């Protein structure tokens, strides 16, 4: 009983609540009120009771140029509705039988226009359907009050940023006549849009109607064929004067039955118009508007307006007469660009240039050729950008001739900053390209060196080892090390030329890397003398193997010493090292030290002769080669790798190496010192002479001055002290003599 009472009370409260809700003006309307305009034709409005488009009741009203005028016209043709605002529709519509002024009934081919929706009562945002795999988004800007087309562009670009297509959208927060502060929209993937479009083609009855629902709609009803195509064709065939309308006499011969059937078909076409517009149809309308020629109109007003010029790909000012014309007519350049920038033909994405391909592809044996190609492409792209900026600069200066001097300076400063930004961007891209190239070259060199070293060690471990194979692999290994050294030195020379500060920073890493190369070669060569039979056979060919590639053309660079333990002597580039220079015993089977057979002549850097035979404290095996086992060799390689990782591998991915001056010239230093001493002596003598001359004064004797003399006599005495002689006195003295 209690549950029944509660249910009755709830039902009464619901009915009471529903009776308090005011009735909406649009209740009972078949479709939403809309108006459409086409310059040169009578305005059209849709009949909200039957969904058909009808001409202007007065037969005089044509296209309007202001939003206020459109709102007023909506209020005139729909006096029974409370029209409060207007907004452009999301989709174009096809309207038939559009009459010229002065003709109330006519039959002409179809015109496609974007109508204006007449909003009734308080603004209510459109409800949007969100299909599967689609996203609902919205944007609000409370400090902006923009048009419908502006927010359509915002929604389209937002979907494009997500690699999706705009499916549907609606305005938010009205702030004026056809002005809003936001937009809500639905973005769908491209494949979803294609499925939606295909389903629309298969059956138009599945679309959403304008405003209310069709009372005769059912899922089993056959699709209503569109009359637009063949009506347009028939009308065009009957158009003899080519003005787009049928001739006058055709209106008089129209059969009432045919006219009634035509009205029914027209109603069906209007009823099948949907709100789920595709982006392509909107783009077609925007393109038709923005690519039209600018028209001043018949009136003689002088209004400054903007129209879009597709050839120049920008908006251009023109003078509008105040009436007529077309829709390629905008109040500001910003509004013009916001609407028409999307109508430009989208350029197909160009294939990736050589720079992008270089960064995407891994390094291979064609590294140098790929790098050269990428560098040329980068320079060509930079020149093209600079040429474009220079052309824009010339155009801006030509347009700024009549501007004030401050504006001219602002234009010049703007383009100077633009050029500087392009230069900085190009420099950064070059630096990135060079660093990538150097890292890849270093990786290739490391790979080749590691491979040749493994092959060389494998040949030494062979049983029995073959001398010719060992020599060949030794040459390849030494060549790989020399390429690494040359690469390091050349790169350092480049860095020192371009950026001396960076060269000073990476100098310690350069020295460490060069030292590691020498230590690696020393240890690898020391292993050769653990195989006396091979060493004795190829000792005369060791020098060509190690020294043939040691003719480094890099200026101021000294070829590496491949003796047992390299000493850099008095080289100013190298830090002080405590290298052992004590002579050691002769090697196995009377072999001399490696510096006698390997060393290259070096007159500037003294190298003490040392024996390359490994000693026990170096951690190398000293047993005969017959007892040298395969599992003992990695110990040497491990030590080498440790030295390498400690001295070089830490930096090779980020640092680039090039050599500084390796040799020192004592004669030049002594000459500079002597010259400096001579110059200093000359300067000191000159200063002493000048100072002595400064204190020299003229004295012609001592004149005793009485303290009681007058000021005139005292002044005369001072003058005489400085060499003054009274000519009168001198004359009388000469007369007396």
UniProtKB/Swiss-Prot annotation:
Its main location: membrane. Residues 690-737 are cytoplasmic. Belongs to the APP family. Residues 193-280 are annotated as: Disordered. It comes from Takifugu rubripes (Japanese pufferfish). The record marks 171 as: Required for Cu(2+) reduction. It is found in: Membrane. Residues 726-729 are annotated as: Clathrin-binding. Residues 29-190 form the E1 domain. Residues 19-668 are extracellular. Residues 193-207, 242-262 have a biased composition (Acidic residues). SUPFAM superfamilies: A heparin-binding domain, Amyloid beta a4 protein copper binding domain (domain 2), BPTI-like, CAPPD, an extracellular domain of amyloid beta A4 protein. The gene is app. Residues 1-18 form the signal peptide. One of its GO terms (biological process) is axonogenesis. Residues 286-344 form the BPTI/Kunitz inhibitor domain. Residues 29-124 are annotated as: GFLD subdomain. Residues 132-190 are annotated as: CuBD subdomain. The keyword Metal-binding applies. InterPro entries: Amyloid_Cu-bd_sf, Amyloid_glyco, Amyloid_glyco_Abeta, Amyloid_glyco_Cu-bd, Amyloid_glyco_E2_domain, Amyloid_glyco_extra, Amyloid_glyco_heparin-bd, Amyloid_glyco_heparin-bd_sf. This is Amyloid-beta A4 protein.
């Amino acid at each position: 009983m209690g549950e029944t009472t509660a249910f009755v009370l709830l039902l009464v409260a619901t009915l009471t609540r529903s009776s308090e809700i005011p009735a909406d003006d649009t209740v009972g309307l078949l479709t939403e009120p809309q108006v459409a305009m086409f310059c040169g034709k009578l305005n059209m409005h849709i009949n909200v009771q039957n969904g058909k488009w009808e001409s202007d009741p007065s037969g005089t009203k044509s296209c309007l140029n202001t939003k206020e005028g459109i709102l007023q016209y909506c209020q005139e043709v729909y006096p029974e509705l409370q029209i409060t605002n207007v907004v452009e529709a999301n989709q174009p519509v096809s309207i038939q039988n559009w009459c010229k002024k002065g003709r109330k009934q006519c039959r002409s081919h179809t015109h496609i226009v974007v109508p204006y929706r007449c909003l009734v009562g308080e603004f209510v945002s459109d409800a949007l359907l969100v299909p599967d795999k689609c996203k609902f988004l919205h944007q609000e800007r409370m400090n902006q009050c923009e048009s419908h087309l502006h927010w359509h562009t915002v929604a389209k670009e937002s979907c494009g940023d997500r690699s999706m297509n705009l499916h549907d959208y609606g305005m938010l927060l009205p702030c004026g006549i056809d002005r809003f502060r936001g937009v809500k929209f639905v973005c769908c993937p491209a494949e979803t849009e294609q499925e939606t479009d295909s389903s629309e083609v298969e059956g138009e009855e599945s679309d959403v109607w304008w405003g209310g629902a069709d009372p005769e709609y059912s899922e089993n009803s056959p699709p209503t064929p569109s009359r637009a195509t063949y009506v347009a064709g028939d009308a065009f065939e009957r158009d003899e004067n080519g003005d787009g309308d049928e001739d006058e006499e055709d209106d008089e011969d129209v059969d009432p039955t045919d006219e009634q059937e035509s009205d029914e078909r027209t109603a069906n076409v209007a009823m099948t118009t949907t709100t789920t517009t595709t982006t392509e149809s909107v783009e077609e309308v925007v393109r038709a508007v923005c690519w039209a020629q600018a028209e001043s109109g018949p009136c003689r007003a002088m209004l400054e307006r903007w129209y879009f010029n597709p050839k120049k790909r920008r908006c251009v000012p023109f003078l509008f007469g105040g009436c007529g014309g077309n829709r390629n007519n905008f109040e500001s350049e910003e509004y013009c660009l916001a609407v028409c920038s999307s109508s430009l033909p989208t350029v197909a994405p160009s294939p990736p240039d050589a720079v992008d391909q270089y960064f995407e592809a891994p390094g291979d044996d064609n590294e140098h050729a790929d790098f050269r190609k990428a560098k040329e492409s980068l320079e060509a792209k930079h020149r093209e950008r600079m040429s474009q900026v220079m052309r824009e600069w010339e155009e801006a200066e030509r347009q700024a001739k009549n501007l004030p001097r401050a504006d001219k300076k602002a234009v010049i400063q703007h383009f100077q900053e633009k050029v500087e930004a392009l230069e900085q961007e190009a420099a950064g891209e070059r630096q990135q390209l060079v660093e990538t190239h150097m890292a890849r070259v270093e990786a290739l060199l490391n790979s080749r060196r590691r491979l040749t070293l493994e092959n060389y060690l494998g040949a030494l471990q062979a049983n029995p080892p073959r001398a010719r194979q060992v020599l060949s692999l030794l040459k390849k290994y030494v060549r790989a090390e020399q390429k690494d050294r040359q690469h390091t030195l050349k790169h350092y020379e480049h860095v020192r030329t371009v950026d001396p500060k960076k060269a000073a920073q990476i100098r310690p890493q350069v020295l460490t890397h060069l030292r590691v190369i020498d230590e690696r070669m020393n240890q690898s060569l020391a292993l050769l003398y653990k195989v006396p039979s091979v060493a004795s056979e190829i000792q005369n060919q060791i020098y060509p193997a190690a020294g043939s590639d040691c003719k480094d053309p890099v200026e101021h660079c000294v070829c590496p010493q491949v003796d047992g333990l390299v000493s850099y002597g008095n080289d100013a580039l190298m830090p002080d090292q405590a290298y052992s220079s004590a002579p050691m015993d002769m090697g196995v089977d009377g072999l001399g030290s490696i510096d006698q057979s390997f060393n290259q002549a070096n007159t500037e850097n003294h190298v003490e002769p040392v024996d390359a035979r490994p000693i026990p404290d170096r951690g190398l095996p000293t047993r005969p080669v017959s007892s040298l086992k395969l599992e003992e060799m990695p110990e040497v390689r491990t030590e080498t790798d440790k030295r390498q990782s400690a001295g070089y591998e830490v930096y090779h991915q980020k640092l680039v190496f090039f050599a500084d001056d390796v040799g020192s010239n004592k004669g030049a230093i002594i000459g500079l010192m002597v010259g400096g001493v001579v110059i200093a002596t000359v300067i000191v003598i000159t200063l002493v002479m000048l100072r002595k001359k400064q204190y020299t004064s003229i004295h012609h004797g001592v004149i005793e001055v009485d303290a009681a003399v007058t000021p005139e006599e005292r002044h005369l005495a001072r003058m005489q002290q400085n060499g003054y002689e009274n000519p009168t006195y001198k004359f009388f003295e000469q007369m007396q003599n």
